[in-house]
Amino acid sequence: MDPSDFPSPFDPLTLPEKPLAGDLPVDMEFGEDLLESQTAPSRGWAPPGPSPSSGALDLLDTPSGLEKDPGGVLDGATELLGLGGLLYKAPSPPEVDHGPEGTLAWDSGEQTLEPGPGCQTPEVMPPDPGAGASPPSPEGLLEPLAPDSPIILESPHIEEEIPPLATRRRGSPGQEEEHTQGQPQSPNAPPSPSVGETLGDGINSSQSKPGVCTPTAHPSLPGDGLTGKEIEKPPERVQKRSERVRRAEPPKPEVVDSTESIPVSDEDSDAMVDDPNDEDFVPFRPRRSPRMSLRSSMAQRAGRSSMGTKMSCAHCRTPLQKGQTAYQRKGLPQLFCSSSCLTTYSKKPLGRKTCTFCKKEIWNTKDSVVVQTGPGGSFHEFCTSVCLSLYEAQQQRPIPQSGDPADATRCSICQKTGEVLHEVSNGSVVHRLCSDSCFSKFRANKGLKTNCCDQCGAYIYARPGGLGPELLFHDGQQKRFCNTTCLGAYKKKNTRVYPCVWCKTLCKNFEMLSHVDRNGKTSLFCSLCCTTSYKVKQAGLTGPPRPCSFCRRSLSDPCYYNKVDRTVYQFCSPSCWTKFQHTSPEGGIHLSCHYCHSLFSGKPEVLEWQDQVFQFCCRDCCEDFKRLRGVVSQCEHCRQEKLLHEKLRFSGVEKSFCSEGCVLLYKQDFTKKLGLCCITCTYCSQTCQRGVTEQLDGSTWDFCSEDCKTKYLLWYCKAARCHACKRQGKLLETIHWRGQIRHFCNQQCLLRFYSQQNQPNLDTQSGPESLLNSQSSESKPQTPSQTKVENNHTVRTPDENGNLGKTPVKRATPSVPTPPPPPPPATPRKNKAAMCKPLMQNRGVSCKAEMKSKGSQTEEWKPQVIVLPIPVPIFVPVPMHLYCQKVPVPFSMPIPVPVPMFLPTTLESTEKIVETIEELKVKIPSNPLEADILAMAEMIAEAEELDKASSDLCDLVSNQSAEGLLEDCDLFGTARDDVLAMAVKMANVLDEPGQDLEADFPKNPLDINPSVDFLFDCGLVGPEDVSTEQDLPRAMRKGQKRLMLSESCSRDSLSSQPSCTGLNYSYGVNAWKCWVQSKYANGETSKGDELRFGPKPMRIKEDILACSAAELNYGLAQFVREITRPNGERYEPDSIYYLCLGIQQYLLENNRMVNIFTDLYYLTFVQELNKSLSTWQPTLLPNNTVFSRVEEEHLWECKQLGVYSPFVLLNTLMFFNTKFFGLQTAEEHMQLSFTNVVRQSRKCTTPRGTTKVVSIRYYAPVRQRKGRDTGPGKRKREDETILEQRENRMNPLRCPVKFYEFYLSKCPESLRTRNDVFYLQPERSCIAESPLWYSVIPMDRSMLESMLNRILAVREIYEELGRPGEEDLD
């Protein structure tokens, strides 16, 4: 039948909102007036009408009764009689007694109906208070009864005749469709629906067309007249929201957004989700569709008319006897014989039919199809016609032939033969499972992690939009659910009520916060306020009770605590605790932690999750928040779902990791995949392929793109702007914010940026949400006198969240009936997020995740223990005989053990070593005793010779008459070093305050101070020594090679012998003391003259060893500027350099290991000395020699030449390059490179034979040699100058070739092929054992000039340049 054939009132879209059968008024309790009404009008109870005294029903005089309301409902029996136009005699009403307990007692009786002309089968109508009988008093109707109150039934059997064309709406919610005629009713159906239909009001009666009479027979209630109280209209029925929801259409599963939280009251929450533990819990049953086929309705009415209405217990099916006490649950029409049957029936599981083909539960019964099909011809029910077609096609499909058909359909778990529900392919084997339980067992046995729902067991398919399943952490495990319905069902099933540990408030476990203490005990709290108070209490930080820190009231019990910046605050209530969180106690910029809600002013720990940014005060709060909110993601390396540890970007894609180990392993694999082109971007820190490379200030940076390079250079050049204050300059703070790099001036700007991002100003918005933002969430409810009653009889009162809501109230109306007002419109909510904000803090934390401890158990975190045996001496007492017998005593005896020694040597020295060993074998006899005697004799002889030589030298020095003999003595032998040492010691004795360096060592040798005449008498110092040649490598021409090589061996013996005096440090120390004494001779110096180190003045000490590094730095700088001779004249720059070298040697000999010429602490002194030496020019003596008081030997003595440090090695290389290559300017030194300075070795012939000579050659650039080569072609090639340094074989410690090789070994290997750099800057953090001493940054010009000025003050530099054959270099 087409739905359009039905009249419009039966259209489900146009049905009015009416109460259904089984719903009682809110003031009527269980069991009272049960059989009075199955349905009630939405406007309340029908008003009483006139009561005829004869008890008969009169006809309507006017056709006004034909007017119907839009819902098609006829109120009162007078309107029904007006439709038929006939008069029927009403039967005598049964006697109704109101017992003392409010039960209804009535007698049974046969009700006869006489059909009139033109009428169909008569229908039994419900009683009407206005149809000639007095209605019961409102007090009797509204008298409350206890739940499950008994009902005394006196006549349980009533027969009913139903017209076949009447269409009825079943009143009980969730009641299934009636079976056809001839089928018994199901146990879940009401046992006697005719009772409600017989004794209800006339609302459910069908509409009648004009000309069709609907005779009714209805018993009237007792009462002959109406009192004033009875005439009054009963109070308007107030419907709860829970009743409205249960009477609504079958609900569809809603998808609840977990990010939004709508404030609901306790009543609303009970209406939305029913608790099976509640007494009024009604299992969900789909309501029968109001549009039934005509055939099914006729069959139902025919079946009802043929069978009696004898009532029985809905559980045990026991017939109810007359006068027996019946039990009924509120809102349900079923009757029970005892309380046990009522309780057992309420706990029965919900029975639903399943589809034969797809095995799913049939929810919508109107679309179901019942057919007789299959091989056995039995009846099967399908959810849709599609399943029926698929089932028939499956039955017609030929069955494949197999060897054993039983094995093909046998379950792999329970080994039962039947239908296969699941097929699992594990490897190459296909497992068939018959049920969900077997599927769960299979997953447990195989250890499979299938994405199945933990509530219903169904497989969770991928949701649209890439959304994953619903997740919930409960009891330390992660639960998965296919939808929000299963999630709600799981919560309802596992909900428990526990008291808060702090405030003892009862709360549900899914709404509480858990805290695990040090002992592993878990405590539950109702809010963060109680959690924080408990932590402060456990830490022992609570002091004596004080007034509330917010409202200054006295504290209640329990009081609440909070700790902010090492200060504990006390509060009287959670509201004061919450309000205090939004205020800054110190007035600065403070952020609120998203976990503990405490204020902090440091750099926050940031977490980005689901397009939101969360801030935390510390790392611990961030980790707890991740476990609490279930911040779980799939690790990119191990592919397991764990807590999120870190998010990193690889080639522009953000990837999640569960631990630092997974980050390192994934980065290692990623680097191997990309190879050498894999870099980490200097700006955005992502690992990707190299895009752009930039070099600046000696540093090389790699970037992923040109954009990152531009932004980084702006930040590096201090041209970027702060994202908070928009200022341009040096930005110290850098963060990653939503995939972008943000820079800030300092931490204050960073905090201001965070506070602006997460705390919008809601007070500037218009609407009621601004008021909600300013009002407190703990405002007291208004008194009834302050509430405003509106026209729709609702009162606006603040709910538990501080929001104004509508609460229905009872209103006593006068006796004159007034039409009810229309339903009020829905209240618009302008700012839904602002109204939900107070609830987001409490409902957002459903349960605390405790998977950290459980997750870490899968990893091998315990280190591997290795047993290491350690010998421990143990004293074992040995019994002795008290010295009466011989006792063994340990005795040590040395045993020679041959130990092989490997001596590093070369091929040249191997033969000499073998010869020396042979000589020792010949020299040392085979008898060890004889060898010891010979060795002792040699030692005694050598000692006697040394004593004799020293005594002769002392006599020679003390003898004044041996002056002529001293002049002829060869003091250039081995004894000269001893004489030099003696001279230095003697010079130290001359510690007089009036020492004058330039007077003792004048430019003219004839003006020598008599106090040091003995030095010249001993031959230590002489004018002829100034021009003494040393055999050291120097530049030469090609034509002079053979001459130089032939003479090299003869001069090798003289190359290591110095021709100068030793450095006398007493001049420098005495000059320092005299300068300090003269500086402070006249008391304190003026403020302009005194030295200052920062804001404090500095006083120089006379003892140079007692001065600190800063005092020595500034003191030496002023010493260089102010030092003068005793006669007041200014010292020459070379003399000042000599004095400073003496101070350096004095510091070293007194174990003060500093270098005042190279250390960075003495930069001020070095700059001042450089200014003095830069203007100095050497003095040419009358004998055409250059005079300088600084000699090469002085530099060796005070460790300015050698390999003591990287700077000293550089100074040594520059000294040799200046001395032998003739490079006297910084430009010439900067032209040196690793490619034009080459080490070469060649063989040459000497009078002693053929020898191998190793040297360093410098091939100067072409532009340097262009001006020097002026002759014709052949002559030009012959006179071409070769700059060369040859090795010093007699003294390898001063060999330039060895220094050059050592310098190459300490330089980076990548720079050894460079043609633009030679001198490199030392590494700041290198030590002597470091493999590299120098960086890739070349020395700057200023440092080279400072070192070169000190080298050019040495006398030997000019002596080497003035040798024959060097004139072509100028």
UniProtKB/Swiss-Prot annotation:
Residues 1-12, 40-56, 130-146 have a biased composition (Low complexity). The modification Phosphothreonine is found at T797, T818, T827. Residues 761-789 have a biased composition (Polar residues). Pfam families: DUF3504, zf-FCS. One of its GO terms (biological process) is cytoskeleton organization. The keyword Nucleotide-binding does not apply. One of its GO terms (molecular function) is zinc ion binding. It is found in: Nucleus. This is Zinc finger MYM-type protein 3. It comes from Mus musculus (Mouse).
